[in-house]
Amino acid sequence: MKVLRVRTYIPGFDEILYGGIPERNIVLISGGPGTGKSILGKQFLYNGLVKKDEPGIFVALEEHPVSVIRSFKHFGWDITKYEKEGKFAIVDAFTAGIGSTAQKEKYVVKDVDNVGELSGVLRDAIRNLNAKRVVIDSVSTLYLSKPAMARSIVMQLKRVIAGLGCTAMFISQVSAGERGFGGPGVEHAVDGIVRLDLDEYEGQLYRSVIVWKMRDSKISMVRHPMDITDEGIVIQWDKYLRITNVKAEIQPLPQKEIEEMKKAVEESEEEKESIQEAEIEEE
């Protein structure tokens, strides 16, 4: 059975996912400070708007809506035009509706500790926009003071988002040097886990990404070098990073594996296009 996938169009990311994220999957993007988690999520939303005209929603739990828009623009991603067209929305779960700027937001969560309220506001936003992509930044904020509730909170949000046909990234914070994913039981509740890391070796920092799991999908089983450029994240999907006690090295993947990844991305795009053509004919 063919798995329908959502292309991220993040350079190198679809390749290491063998075609993209399976539709309706909830993917945990985990990592320490400065690893590029939020950038990855915003790039996922922006690419959906530009490449596929897919409406998206950003749930802001740690940034003021003004800061969110500014951070998009930092990479040349102007989402204000899509916001005006009703194709992009920010769910403000940061300001609690306080302040003149916050009062202009259409989707506001006044009590962030009330996951039921957040789910309701998010449900309304998804339905109104007919959204296809959602990013929550960061989901770990919701259970910092109640870690025992982490899994149930994630499951509640997952039911709403996947139930309405969306594919999502949940940004999850971990401490620098910590190798977990952020929140007990969360890794079992989500469909996919992607870990971003920033490692130091002999005074030099190395960025990398590794896919720990992805339901209904083959994945690359190695750690890939990654860069944050002026245009966003770029993953060196055809190379792997290896850091030991004695050296750090970047080596090319076997050619067979490179060809398999390229083919998977091409087939994913062809499958999506054929389905869209069939839907147009039915209309």
Swiss-Prot record:
Keywords on record: ATP-binding, Nucleotide-binding
Positions of transmembrane segments: none
Domain of life: Archaea
Chain intervals for the UniProt region annotation (Disordered): 261-283
Cross-referenced PROSITE patterns: KAIC (PS51146)
GO molecular function per UniProt: ATP binding
InterPro entries: KaiC-like_dom (IPR014774), KaiC_dom (IPR010624), P-loop_NTPase (IPR027417), UPF0273_KaiC-like (IPR022475)
Compositional bias segments (type: Acidic residues): 267-283
Residue positions binding ATP: G31, G32, P33, G34, T35, G36, K37, S38
Residue span, KaiC domain: 4-249
One Pfam family here: ATPase
HAMAP family, A to Z: UPF0273
PANTHER family referenced in this protein's UniProt entry, alphabetically: UPF0273 PROTEIN TM_0370
Record family assignment: Belongs to the UPF0273 family.
Protein name: UPF0273 protein STK_18300
Taxonomic lineage from the root: Archaea, Thermoproteota, Thermoprotei, Sulfolobales, Sulfolobaceae
